[in-house]
Amino acid sequence: PGGAAPPAPRGRAARGAAHAPRPPPPPPRAPASAPVIGTPWAAGPGTGTGSPSPGAGEGAPTAPGPSPGGTDRGAGDPGAGDSGAGRAPGALPFDLPGPAALRTGEAGRKLVFAHYFTPYPLSLDNASADADYYARNYLNPAGENGKHERYGGLLRDRPLPVSPKPGDWERANLEQEVRTARAAGLDGFTLDMLSLSGPNRDRAQLLMEAAHAVDPAFKVMLMPDMTSLNTDDPGVLADAVAALGKAPAAHRLGDGRLVVSPFKAEAKSVAWWTQVLDLLRTRHGIRTAFVPTFLDFDANSARFAPISHGFSEWGSRSYVGQESATRDVQRAHGLGKIWMQPVSVQDARPNQGVYDEAGNTATLRSTWTHAIDDGADWVQLTTWNDYSEGSQFAPSQHNGYTYLDLSSYYLTKFKTGSWPKIVRDTLYVSARTQFASADPTGPQSLVMSLRKGSAAPRDTVEVLSFLTAPATVRTEVGGARDAHEAPAGIHSELLPLRPGTSSAAVVRGGKAATEVELPYAADRTVRVQDLQYYAATSGRD
């Protein structure tokens, strides 16, 4: 990307297979110093001072039409549809505006999508979570006949377990994911088009149907994956895009153009992409807005500018080097293009032997802050559910709703222009369950090493507090008790990781009112390497 840390390129493969080797990253730029994360934001976001409470209310349904942010929306409230799994009362430190407030006016022009990766839906076989495909084959190092044993198993986390369902359970589960994303304030998904046929293609079609059924205003941006789609024929890709692009859920601009945002667009030439776009128009009657997502924006922006409506980049996954996003947005806007900013939480890939140091929630907060401060037009959360990269924002077994809940806070500022007022104390605790230098004792032979350009490894527990007023925060890490004074608003406190569990509590008047425990214990001796940060929030059970 345009900064110190190289991008996090990815390989793609069908469900159950290890990803293909990832392409080499471009040379890193000069390293940048990490942001200060152990101090409060001076007069910063979340204090409620000078920030009016945004939005309210919901109304009638909108007619199908262009995606939020368009000019031909039609009358009515885009927040209508199946309310599904709404937000738990009191889950967030602030009151999240409803879809009506987040999808109209200026807020409706700032769009937030999450990258949906079809190999990892809520369930792969509709079985009980303790014995389903995830448990037997992806989390188990011996799963799939030992094909993942070399790197300790394909995954380290999984979607929050769901109960087996009667009938069309795959469709029902996809609808549940749409409801979850909608309840967090998201405008839609970017759909990774991995293959032209097979289970991933079938699931892509089902997602388009599920999105429209739950909420006609929830849109799906098509993202042909040029690391895995096995075709050099522009006509084949044009046909594949058209087949999904005709669905009502497909993301279109207000003028009716279908948004197409290929992943690693630079894998094909500008001339090749011009043929694809021409065929979509002449063969299928589809006008397009081309928003290529690059692994290397610097090297490709000028060449692609004549055919592009906007640009995006996959981005890096560490909190250092993110200041380059400022220049990327400026360059895109200078070329008259919109910019879709990648926002990430972490990245750890056992099957590729690489990870980035996310610094607890530092990467999430840094990437969101750049999207806000630098004037990005759209945001892509990278990713919703790619568990093989450990980059998931979606509710998961080891993180619960923590990362999605935190994103809702920054999303509100991004879309409304105002920091939401903190109305209830909320604590977030994050830590690894092992030390960064731990050497696994099991048969794992491929271990993850730090990606070049990443921040240095650290062994820390972070207590991130959102407080309505100053308070004492009492902590316990591996039996070591401590306390610190936290100001109103947001405060990040770092503590050394110790073997055992971690917990925190807000104390006022000698009484603990808000408490959180990260139940996953850290250990110095581990059988399988796992360098993801686990997280918990006091806002949810």
Predicted regions, residues:
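A short beta-strand segment in extracellular, disulfide-stabilized domains
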Residues: 462-464
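Glycan-processing catalytic domains of CAZymes
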Residues: 84-459, 468-541
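N-terminal low-complexity, Pro/Thr-rich disordered segments
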Residues: 1-90, 94
